[in-house]
Curated annotation (Swiss-Prot):
It comes from Anaeromyxobacter dehalogenans (strain 2CP-C). The keyword ATP-binding applies. Residues 10-239 form the ABC transporter domain. InterPro entries: AAA+_ATPase, ABC_transporter-like_ATP-bd, ABC_transporter-like_CS, ABC_transpr_LolD-like, MacB-like_ATP-bd, P-loop_NTPase. Its EC number is 7.6.2.-. It is found in: Cell inner membrane. ATP binds at residues 46-53. Keywords: ATP-binding, Cell inner membrane, Cell membrane, Membrane, Nucleotide-binding, Translocase, Transport. This is Lipoprotein-releasing system ATP-binding protein LolD. The lineage of its organism: Bacteria, Pseudomonadati, Myxococcota, Myxococcia, Myxococcales. The keyword Nucleus does not apply.
Length: 239
């Protein structure tokens, strides 16, 4: 008997996105087709202004396309109202950004607990246990109760990774997660993302300008002027 085929984590079909300012319409994405399978570790590359952040916003259920279809974890976003999109986003997707956006007055543990408290509307003892477990997994067991401002840049980004994993997402979207780090810290953070991908089967889509890191992904998707121009295990020559 054949093994069941896992539902792709991301499916985009003919996706277009225009931004409208009065009478001016600015097309940003032009008929993008993209499928990201469950458990893939994919880099998204392209020059500034190519539409990478716009694409990530659509996949992250932070915006809706002008045309085409977006499916995340098997759900067609066209069938979801705004509340349902927010619930799906909270349950299904984790985010890691170049700027970690930690609350400076909160401890590492409190920052990781924020998504859990937002989902339940209150704090609970099991949240602290989960947060501690995640922070230990990212190597921060010794600084659980240290405020964000007392942590190094690499440590702060590790807290952000733990926070992104707090709701056990199927998909993590990482937008330049190593952009503010030195080479050593960037390698450590990238290795952590890869470890969670391999150990937990989480799908990762990582925006990066760093070809050295992109080459360590399973797949590289290149976006230029709102169109996918390459998709495979290697970058285009000279890209």
């Amino acid at each position: 008997m054949a093994e069941p085929v896992a539902t792709p984590t991301v499916e985009l079909s003919g996706v277009r996105k225009d931004y409208v300012a009065g009478p001016v319409v600015t097309p940003v994405l032009h008929g993008v087709d993209l499928t990201v399978g469950a458990g893939e570790f994919t880099a998204l590359m392209g020059p500034s202004g190519s539409g990478k952040s716009t694409l990530l916003n659509l996949i992250g259920l932070l915006d809706r396309p002008t045309g085409g279809r977006v499916r995340v974890a098997g759900l067609d976003t066209a069938a979801l109202d705004d509340d349902a999109m927010a619930r799906t986003r909270g349950r299904t997707i984790g985010f890691v950004f170049q700027f970690h956006h930690l609350l400076p007055a909160f401890t590492a543990l409190e920052n990781v607990m924020i998504p859990m408290m937002a989902a339940r509307g209150r704090a609970a003892p099991d949240m602290a246990e989960c947060g501690e477990h995640l922070l230990r997994q990212v190597g921060l067991g010794a600084v659980l109760h240290r405020r964000a401002t007392q942590l190094s840049g690499g440590q702060q980004q590790r807290v952000a990774i733990a926070r992104a994993l707090a709701m056990a997402p199927r998909l993590v979207l990482a937008d330049e997660p190593t952009g503010n780090l030195d080479t050593h810290a960037a390698d450590e953070v990238f290795a952590l993302l890869r470890e969670f991908n391999r150990r937990a089967g989480i799908t990762f889509l990582i925006v990066t300008h760093d070809p050295r890191l992109a080459d360590r992904c399973d797949r590289i998707v290149e976006l230029v002027d709102g169109r996918i121009v390459a998709d495979g295990p290697h970058r285009r020559s000279g890209a």
